[in-house]
Regions:
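C-terminal catalytic subdomain
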Residues: 169, 173-175
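Conserved "HGTGT" condensation-loop signature of ketosynthase/thiolase-family condensing enzymes
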Residues: 1-67, 72-74, 80-169
């Protein structure tokens, strides 16, 4: 039912709000309970059924973000400290099939295939990952990835390091 799905979304995102509440850079550092997230009120109005306001991203600041990829040689030449280096081990790029052309309109196969391909390129499996930051403006993509790669929503590693897009923020929120 819609209510069961809304409850599942609240259970998925409440732990993310808890992480964001402890993050000094969070745009919305408030821990929210499942009930706060799923209950429609004047302050948590329905944005688009089944998503109340507190379960979707809300831009609060306007800015941009970027990542610069370079070789080790270039990083050394530019004086980038090794403590700031991040090695790209796996990657993938997929194009999603048009919504009405999918066998299941409630799934996003390309995102799951992209995760699987990135893991394959990296030569690792989902169990080799020690930390996740599944980032989306609303719950469906997080569920989609979890379901598609066999990751439990209550995995002890957690699903976010930052607090997730609705609570920590994104490029539009100084991320």
């Amino acid at each position: 039912s819609v209510q069961d799905y809304r409850q599942a979304m609240g259970e998925l995102f409440a732990p993310m709000s808890k992480v964001a509440a402890k993050n000094p850079y969070s745009s919305a550092p408030v821990e929210r309970t499942v009930d706060e997230l799923v209950t429609v009120t004047d302050k948590n109005r329905m944005i688009c059924d089944p998503y109340p306001r507190l379960m979707v991203a809300r831009d609060q600041v306007n800015m941009g973000a970027a990542a610069v990829l370079m070789s080790v040689e270039s990083a050394r030449k530019l004086g980038v400290p090794e403590s700031k280096w991040v090695y790209l081990r796996g990657h993938a790029d997929m194009k999603e099939q048009k919504l009405l052309g999918r066998p299941d309109v409630g799934a996003s196969p390309a995102s799951v295939l992209a995760v699987r391909e990135a893991l394959r390129v990296a030569g690792i499996g989902i169990d080799d990952i020690s930390a996740f930051d599944l980032y989306s403006c609303f719950p469906f993509p997080v569920f989609n990835i979890c379901d598609g790669v066999g990751l439990d929503a209550d995995d002890p590693r957690g699903l976010t390091l930052t607090g997730g897009l609705p609570y920590f923020g994104g490029p539009g929120n100084n991320y």
